[in-house]
Amino acid sequence: MYSLSDFDFELPQELIAQTPLAERSASRLLHVAQDGMIDRAFADIVDLLNPGDLLVFNDTRVLKARFFGVKETGGKVEVLVERVIDSAHVHAQIRASKSPVPGMKIRLADAFDVIVGERAGEFYELQFPGDIFALIEAHGRLPLPPYIEHAADAYDETRYQTVYAKTPGAVAAPTAGLHFDQALLDTLKAKGVQFAYVTLHVGAGTFQPVRNENLAEHNMHSEWYTISQETVGAVHAAQAAGHNIVAVGTTSMRALESASQSGSLQAGSADTRLFITPGYTFKTVTRLITNFHLPKSTLLMLVSAFAGYDAIRAAYQHAISQRYRFFSYGDAMFLTRMPPC
């Protein structure tokens, strides 16, 4: 039985990637194989996949979800849109010296006013005055992760999105997908590797460390996903032919496994609080492409459940010793599902 301290590790600060490499696919890839570890280039992913294998990408698009504003009382606030609820309302985190109250107006980006609604846990409901996505795109700022020390610029607005991002709604990028450029996608397709897409809107909770030593006490954050019947058909066809289902990132993994709780993948949309820890039985995914994750994070627990705790522990020690780049703008791993006990 694992506890929180089992997922802690010391990471030299200089290994936290602050900027992306000049070329998306120029990053490194640590291949954690059954018989050891192999240092590769990310472009080698072509050699690790066979014709008929199915890559499942998360096509969410990161919103410019961060705003700075002023309450009608004059106090400064910072707003992070967590989720778009409908055409007029969002859930958002608000940082202010004094908590806003329902009915209060907040001027955002010196451009438009939102009205504060009821508070639900750590989020406030905010009413926007018009097209939410248009206002966010025009006036918001890209919300880079807290460990990236520079303010988002125009370069980040391109590079903190996947090249196939389509469905706006995330406040963090599905970072394993950042390594794929169009040339690499074309090479994979020419080899006969198949593509499918899910949408899971990554929330700010993805960066939150677990705080309970007893993992069973952790309150997992909620994220919304949708999986089409077309994707379900592609997964079932690949499985029937004996091919691998390769999740591009933990967010694709979370969507696929959340929709497979009946035993096989089902189409639909839902909120998921699925918390994957060692001992979980994977139902759909057989391979995983993922970046290196934060200490004590739910994502580190997920990859440990998938590839094996000891294998991941050794892989992270190897990555640190070999100076891999960590976190969102960092390098990647290619993992094989651990055989069931």
From Swiss-Prot:
The keyword Lyase does not apply. One of its GO terms (biological process) is queuosine biosynthetic process. InterPro entries: QueA, QueA_dom1, QueA_dom2, QueA_sf. SUPFAM superfamilies: QueA-like (SSF111337). Pathway: tRNA modification; tRNA-queuosine biosynthesis. It comes from the Bacteria. Its EC number is 2.4.99.17. It is found in: Cytoplasm. One of its GO terms (molecular function) is S-adenosylmethionine:tRNA ribosyltransferase-isomerase activity. The keyword Transferase applies. Coiled coil: none annotated. It is an enzyme of class 2 (transferase). Keywords: Cytoplasm, Queuosine biosynthesis, S-adenosyl-L-methionine, Transferase. It catalyses: 7-aminomethyl-7-carbaguanosine(34) in tRNA + S-adenosyl-L-methionine = epoxyqueuosine(34) in tRNA + adenine + L-methionine + 2 H(+). GO terms for cellular component: cytoplasm. Monomer. Transfers and isomerizes the ribose moiety from AdoMet to the 7-aminomethyl group of 7-deazaguanine (preQ1-tRNA) to give epoxyqueuosine (oQ-tRNA). Belongs to the QueA family. This is S-adenosylmethionine:tRNA ribosyltransferase-isomerase. It comes from Herminiimonas arsenicoxydans. The lineage of its organism: Bacteria, Pseudomonadati, Pseudomonadota, Betaproteobacteria, Burkholderiales.
